[in-house]
Amino acid sequence: MRATDADWLDAAARLAVRARPLSRPNPAVGAILVKDGVVIGRGWTQPGGRPHAEAVALKQAGDRATGATAYVTLEPCAHRSERGPPCCDLLVASGVPRAVIGVADPDPRTSGKGAQRLHKAGIETHILDHAASRASLAGYLTRTALDRPHVTLKLALSLDGCVATMSGHSRWITGEAARAHVHSRRALADAILVGGGTWRADQPRLDVRLPGLENRSPRRIVLTRGVAPEGVEAISAPERIAQLDGVQYLYIEGGPLTAAAFLQEDLVDRLEIYRAPIIIGGGVSAIGDLGQDALADAHGRWALVDCRQLGSDSYEAYSRTR
């Protein structure tokens, strides 16, 4: 079966994830060069934001780039930097006759200009508004559009929706496979947040403890009106996340009150639920009171985007729909 443009962009989006979170402050972008159905170059944004994905892929392809199609998750940049020329100029110089772009860049320095420059140079250019590309750029797009990080709320709970027994015992609800997966998700975040209660009760390390990924531990944030512990930043209210400079992806592991606080402020973009096959009965609910009176208001807010088995536990990811 012949791969479609969307298929190649799917592959580029998977490459883009490799850039997180080390590409900051630049977005994590993926690029693939395809010629006669064969990948001749691939790249993703490098640590510190340079080189860009297109530059990496073009360097790998070399002279073979002439006649290839370029697949890029984000519209190639059109502004010159002291660290290198615009990516659209690199593509024009490479001799690619066709470019397929996943998402238009909302940055006013590039928005529309990158695609326009390619088109003026005679390159057949398409912008698809591609779902996987958009998902891989969620942090950048959220920060640009809403001036805040993309927020993921993680919950580990029992079949009956509890995060702890009534006595407060919560270690461990899920098994080793689920906990390792949590560490892989932490490694993709710029910052991780817990509530003051969780910090005082557990003193969590909030780091990444997977071999080879120790350098990807995120910044640690505590939601508290008190003084931040040493080595930890503090914010006093959920809406203050907008002030976290350099943070495109925020991962929340707080307790019921913290979860409710962010949900009430409509600041959660993604829910990640790790569900263990246990029943606690009468335990601590995963989410505090949201003041929800009508069930109709609760429906239609979340769509399942991923699910898998992790040992004996299940993992479900939901994206906000409204």
How does the language model describe each region?
Residues 33-132, 261-263:
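Zn2+-dependent cytidine deaminase-like catalytic core
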Residues 111-115, 137-141, 204-207, 283-286:
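Short secondary-structure transition/capping segments
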Residues 2-26, 41-42, 60-61, 65, ...:
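Enzymes that bind and transform nitrogen-containing heteroaromatic metabolites
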Residues 79-81, 107-111, 133-137, 160-165, ...:
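Short, well-ordered, mixed-charge alpha-helical segments that flank or form enzyme active sites
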Residues 30:
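Helix-turn-helix
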Residues 21-22, 50, 115, 126-156:
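Proteins enriched for Cys/Gly/acidic motifs involved in redox and nucleic-acid/cofactor modification
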